[in-house]
Amino acid sequence: MPFQEVSIMDERREFVRLAMQEGANRRELCRRFGIHPDTGYKWIDRGAFDGELGDRSRRPHSSPARTERAIEDRVLAIRDEHPAWGARKIWRCLDWAGIEAPAISTVHEILRRNDRIVAPAGGAVARVRFEKPAPNLLWQMDFKGWVRLGDGRRCHPLTIIDDHSRYDVGLEACADEQGNTVQTRLQLIFRRYGLPQAFFVDNGAPWGDSSGQRWTRFGVWLLKLGIDVLHSRPYHPQSRGKNERFHRTLKAEVFALNRLRDLPHAQQAFDTWREVYNLERPHEALGQQVPASRYRPSTRSMPDRLPQVEYDDGEIVRAVPTSKDYVSFKGRLWKVPQAFRGERVAIRPLSVDGGYGIFFGAHQIAKINLTDPECVGDVSEQVSAMSPN
């Protein structure tokens, strides 16, 4: 798919589609998109009148293409615009356009007859899918493997997918995989789409420490925003199936079809394709509907100031030094993860005799066993045997 620079019209389409979702807070959406409410409501009225973003299954009174030759030309035109799309997606696009499309098998035969079919390398492996019941309960975040650009630099694509709707809330062309880079990109994404309840990530950097520790400064930043960080089981990439599938689609529909010169060029290509993916491309896991049909922005807005963790009166609270990884309790020093240097933590009794937990807000980050001073360390994360897919 040849890319073009994302226009104001593309942003308008996304705004109107999200604003027309049931229960959408339209005034808040105007604020997040940086447009005046009067302008936003005008766009919404035009979108509803034109029907461009309404019920796409509603057919017009007369089909724009009825002849066999015209339908075949339309099938091939869609395929040429989106070379990675198969018969099912093309059939759905014909249906949305109000064209009396032939059977999916006929669409496939049109593609085969016109040399648009490439034999698959092997059969797909069926997997049981799990998903959250509503948008923004879980976002899956990952880096696709880096790609070499025309100027010789590396591009590290950062991908963020809403688990329920498969809506791509973020597709960023990054120069590295550092926590600060991700944090900067997320701030812009949060201001547009709001905050998720949790992120699902793997165990590598920047979500995990290279030394094997679970917590990083980036993760602490998310906790302060009230966002949980869930890690997949080690050596089980299939538990992040939505990310893996998205990465394959990105490779087939962007990298395989475009030679990207540099990072700005890559970001333009990502932005253009992201609009297609969210608003136009039928998704098999969604019954050939588009992700935008199931997504709505979070009601939790990005705060102007980073909230500080609060503790109840009477709790045992300690300040972790900025240069050491210890807090004092009962006359001894107890280790905490390095990521919490300079933060305030609470020490709370656990159900185990003589045991205490060190907490950052509601999250236990380390443990204390007064009967065995040597048995002190970070709390290992309890990962469900059924990780989100």
Regions found by a protein language model. Give the residues of each.
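Basic, flexible linker segments flanking DNA-binding modules
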Residues: 45, 51-147, 216-219, 290-300
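Charged alpha-helix within mobile-element recombinases
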Residues: 211, 218-305, 346, 351
